[in-house]
UniProtKB/Swiss-Prot annotation:
Function description: Catalyzes the N-acylation of UDP-3-O-acylglucosamine using 3-hydroxyacyl-ACP as the acyl donor. Is involved in the biosynthesis of lipid A, a phosphorylated glycolipid that anchors the lipopolysaccharide to the outer membrane of the cell.
Gene name of the encoded protein: lpxD
Reaction catalyzed: a UDP-3-O-[(3R)-3-hydroxyacyl]-alpha-D-glucosamine + a (3R)-hydroxyacyl-[ACP] = a UDP-2-N,3-O-bis[(3R)-3-hydroxyacyl]-alpha-D-glucosamine + holo-[ACP] + H(+)
Name of the protein in question: UDP-3-O-acylglucosamine N-acyltransferase
GO terms, biological process: lipid A biosynthetic process
Database matches in PANTHER family: UDP-3-O-ACYLGLUCOSAMINE N-ACYLTRANSFERASE (PTHR43378), UDP-3-O-ACYLGLUCOSAMINE N-ACYLTRANSFERASE 1, MITOCHONDRIAL-RELATED (PTHR43378:SF2)
Domain of life: Bacteria
Protein family membership: Belongs to the transferase hexapeptide repeat family. LpxD subfamily.
């Protein structure tokens, strides 16, 4: 696909400074050629502006003079994404409902849906208009899938799960498996039935092989606009707010409540029955064992406030040397005590 820079600027509301020309794709500053657009969002790559061969660069206004052709943006990274969408190849071209799909007679599939071979749609399930179900998807009985959704291969929605409009579920996502509920008894470990469900809002994206368990009672929820990375685990009865960013390998234990606009970096672990306030940021590999008030930034295991965490990071590399010095001081102190004792 070939587009003129003036066309892209018009579509995205950007200012074109320099020669109007045709481009056919998007690439990094380092790899882009004369027929490609690039972008600068991270100051770390400022030096590449002078060496890039890109036909045009999406930049903030203060850097427009540093390139021959600029698309001036208030948010270069976001507008890079919008530009990329103009050139991105659509995944899949199947239309209609495959004869190799199994659709229960009581299920309802909306207009314009693409249901690939080897999809199963159970009794009373409802699929919204324009939704795409890739091969191997399992939609259990009484599930509701909104309009404009994309479910990539082998996504599983167990019975009664609901997802809103315009959601993207990547390969291997499982929503509505039983929560981890067991009781120790004199007869061994006994299962507690998990009879609730999972409800996902609209405009939610969930990464590959992420699992969100059904609740014991009630609903496990994820709010509108939240984005969840690959390999994340949400336990039963978790309530997650809107517009959260949850990075890979996060685990949130059962019945924890997470507010809106929360960010959890990679490998964060959150204990159960906690409250994480809106606007909280949790650093990577943190272990959260107590409630966090709204707006806080925390890190570490156990998680502490940012200033304490940063001081801890500063001290940690010095500990081996401090340990040696402490041992030496203890030895000198013992010798001094012995000397004083002998003098008495």
């Amino acid at each position: 696909m070939v587009r003129r820079l003036s066309e892209i600027a018009g579509l995205l509301g950007l200012e074109l400074r320099g020669e109007d020309r045709e481009v056919s794709g998007v690439n990094t500053l380092e790899a882009a050629g004369p027929d490609e657009i690039s972008f600068l969002a991270n100051p770390r790559y400022m030096g590449q502006l002078s060496t890039t061969r890109a036909g045009a660069v999406i930049v903030a206004a203060e850097h427009a003079q540093d390139v021959a052709v600029a698309l001036v943006s208030a948010n270069p990274y976001f507008d890079f994404g919008r530009t990329l969408a103009l050139f991105a190849r659509k995944q899949g071209s199947f239309e209609g409902v495959s004869e190799q799909a199994v659709v229960h007679p009581e299920a309802v599939v909306g207009e314009g849906c693409a249901v690939y071979p080897h999809v199963y749609i159970g009794p009373r399930a409802r699929i919204g208009a324009g939704t795409v179900l890739f091969p191997g998807c399992y939609i259990g009985e009484d599930c509701v899938v909104g309009g404009g959704c994309t479910l990539y291969p082998n996504v599983v929605l167990m019975a009664g799960v609901e997802i809103g409009d315009d959601c993207i579920l990547h390969a291997g996502v499982v929503l509505g498996a039983d929560g981890f509920g067991f009781a120790r008894t004199e007869f061994g470990i006994q299962k507690i039935p998990q009879v609730g469900t999972v409800r996902i809002g609209s405009d939610v994206e969930i990464g590959a092989n992420t699992t969100i368990d059904r609740s014991v009672l009630g609903v496990t929820t994820v709010g509108d606009g939240t984005k969840i990375d690959n390999l994340v685990m949400l336990g039963h009865n978790v309530e997650m707010g809107r517009n959260c960013l949850i990075v890979s390998q996060v685990g949130i234990s059962g019945s924890t409540k997470v507010g809106d606009d929360v960010t959890m970096a990679g490998q964060v672990g959150v204990a159960g029955h906690l409250s994480i306030g809106s606007g909280v940021t949790i650093g990577p590999k943190s272990g959260v064992a107590k409630d966090i008030p709204a707006g806080e930034t925390v890190g570490g295991a156990p998680a502490v406030d940012k200033s304490t965490y940063m001081r801890t990071l500063t001290v940690m590399p010095k500990l081996p040397d401090m340990y040696k010095r402490l041992g030496k001081l203890e030895k000198e102190l013992a010798e001094l005590k012995k000397s004083l004792s002998e003098e008495q």
